[in-house]
Amino acid sequence: MPLYDPKTTALISIDLQGLVLGRALAPHSGQQVVDNTAAIATSLKAAGGTIILVTVGFSPDYADAVNQPADDALHFPEGGLPTAALAVPPEIAALTADVHIVKHHWSAFYGTEMDLQLRRRGIRTVILAGVATNFGVESTIRDAFAHNYAVIAAEDAMTSFSPEMHDFSCRYILPRLARIRKTAEIVTNS
């Protein structure tokens, strides 16, 4: 039995851009995540699926960024993010996404037209890939689940800032919300 119907499935690629890929990542390298995401996208697109590229972006004054007190809050450079931080790798840029969503928070659903874009395309299943497993990816998976989408998490097409962060999410949180699969299983749809 197939894992998904390509015609009603979208790959949602989270934050594959210099801002995140330039950091130390584990257990999978940024390049592994990019390569695996590209493999899933190529296979899904050839079968009639939808590709959604999600990047994070802010205005130069960060007026659209969440600015709540936190013990380990994010800090941004004055004057806006540099161009290199916003750039996506060539392997991802070459995929020609059907939709590009710019988000300002962890979840690709929060404050964006993600749900509208998925529903208008008849999408019922979403495949998640990207960085970081336990931040942007997990937040988007939680919201996809809450919006009643079937979710597949591409375990080796996502990563975090430590193996422990990635593993905790994949072992204890995501199995309650999604089917966890390797890239090879998703590409072969089995």
Where are the regions a protein language model picked out?
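Generic, well-ordered alpha-helical segments
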Residues: 29-36, 68, 80, 84
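Active-site-adjacent betaalpha module
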Residues: 1-10, 39-47, 72-190
